[in-house]
Amino acid sequence: VMDEAKSHTILVSEFVDLLQGKRLIKDNVRQALKIITEVSEDVKNGKKYILFPEGGYEFNNRNRVCDFKAGSFKSAIKAHVPIVPIALIDSYKVFNSFYLWPITTQVHYLEPIYYEEYKDMKSKEIAELVKQRIQDKISSIL
């Protein structure tokens, strides 16, 4: 699931199409609800999704975790599926023109958060929980 406007950049468009991703028009509530429902059904049927709940990519973010958009977790809530936080370290360097040599990016899959753990939480609380776990992992490594 990606912002429609940003999904048409070089390489990104190809990846979104290859992975059969969804393009989200940020200010279109009706379309957002449709995508949440589609993603929920896809997930129930076994399809995996990668979400970047920060809602965008900050250039040269230096491994800072920005605020998460609570709506990013609505599909998981609706589908009653686990949320697997993933901490990315140094991924920003790939998109930063200051780094012209090979980049090593770390990908850390954290413990899943099962539906039973988050079922009584609001989506904003889930967003904070996931963000905190990712930030804790990044802080423990850097």
How should each PLM-predicted stretch be described?
Residues 1-29:
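Catalytic core of membrane glycerolipid acyltransferases/transacylases, capturing the structured
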Residues 32:
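Glycine-rich anion/phosphate-binding loops
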Residues 35-142:
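Non-catalytic C-terminal accessory region of glycerolipid acyltransferases
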